[in-house]
Amino acid sequence: VRSSAASDVYKRQAAAVQLLKRIHEIELYEFKEAIKQINEYKMEINDYLDIMMIWFRDILLYKATTDVNGLIFKDEVYDIKKQASKSSYSGIEAILEALEKAKVRLTANVNFDLVMELLLLTIKEN
């Protein structure tokens, strides 16, 4: 049971990171497919959103310090550096706020697909 749970966590993390690495290249019409992928993790959506938060925490940390030692996603340094150079502090803040807002909306039973679409749009814009 333990290795199955660990592999689920790894799959969830890999899926979230893959999406975040290519979010700026995704066209709007591809969002539906991305949301369908996220839907696979609907039961663990808070964990999925936490992974996204950690990703943007790493981007913010690198942008502020240019130090890779404090990063959680150490194996993704190249992509973190790339996104840190493209993102502004206010953009990262907007994304982190959107992640929190998504959690609140999901707790309030707002339509899952709509919440994810708004979140992905905010991430893409920033």
What do the PLM-derived regions correspond to, one by one?
Residues 1, 72, 118:
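Short, well-ordered beta-to-alpha junction loops that form the rim of enzyme active sites
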